[in-house]
Every structure is written in structure tokens, then in C-alpha cells.
Amino acid sequence: MAFDGFITKSIIEELKPHLIGGKINKVFEPTKNDIVLSIYSNGNNYTLALSSNPETCRIGLTTYSKPNPQVAPNFCMLLRKYLIGSKIIDISTMDLERTVQIKFEAYNELNDLVIRKLFVEIMSRQSNIILTNENNIIIDTLKHVESGTRELLPAHEFEFTAINKESFLKLNSFDEFYNTFNSSDEKTLSKIMPSQL
């Protein structure tokens, strides 16, 4: 199943009541593209799978368990350091973007309350998982990216990859929707939704 903006937003809305307020117990990296978070929330244990696999990128709850490497990769160790014991305080997307933000709070070694964010980009070959501080400064990423158009590296600011389309969620009336539809080169709803909205 392809993860477009509609599906991503729908899944996030389903995850919220189960996971917000939950605490991270364990973190695994079973493959180079996958992160698994074990979460205790509302008296239940949940397993949240985050995948940056270009062909099967996704986010969602799972009961399927993959074998984990005997030695945890570096990014997994970093996530364990910063996230185990943290509480999930929000899960969100921006409109119909395919970037999911999971916000955590935890106490550091000085007993100060700190906020961290885990961004999951569900975008085929550009899929990635990024850990930042409260100000969106990257702590580390599953995949380092250094290109002319975008850099995803530690100490850099994380910037959303926005789709330059008008979100139908921002349209205030049927007339606005009709005008957007009517001004498009596409004349069928199935084509205009992905291309213009």
C-alpha cells in the first residue's frame, strides 16, 4: 500500500489515542532501513514500526517481530540513549505532507525537562528517520544526506520537504474547492486530488 498524504494522516490519527502519553521501553534496528519502538501506554504494550525502505516506507503498529543484530548499529544506540524512558507527547503531520513528527519529553542528567523530536519521512527513495532537539537541530539521522539541494547531517537544521500544492484542508468553502478544481488542467477528481491538492 502506497503511503500518500491521506493515508499518512489517517494512520497518525489512529495512533494518537494509543501512543500519546506512552513511554519508550526499547529501541531496535532490525535492518538498515527499519526502526522499531517498544512503547508502554495505557496499560498495554505496543510495537511501532518505522521504515525508510524505499519500496515499503511506512509507519504503523505491528505484531510482527524481526530478528535483531547481536550488536546494535550506531543510530539505534543513539536512539536508545535519547529516547528510552521518554514520554510521547504528540504525533503529527503538516497538512497532507508525508513527514511524521513524534515529539518526546524526558529528563536529562541535570534533571531538566527536554523535548526531542523524531521525524519519519515517508517518501520512497528519500525516506529517512531523523532525530532532532526541540529547535529542529539534527542530532543524527538513519541515512546521512549531503546534496546540492538538501543536507541531513548532525548539527544542521532539519527542514521539511514541502510539496508545493494547495492542501484541500485549507479550503474554506465549496466555492474555493470548485475554483481550484476548475482552474486545473486536469478535469477529473481522481487526477486533480494528487496534482493540485
How would you name each of these model-derived features?
Residues 43-197:
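Phosphate/anion-contacting hairpin/loop surfaces
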Residues 6-67, 71:
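A structured, charge-rich N-terminal accessory region that forms the first stable segment of a protein
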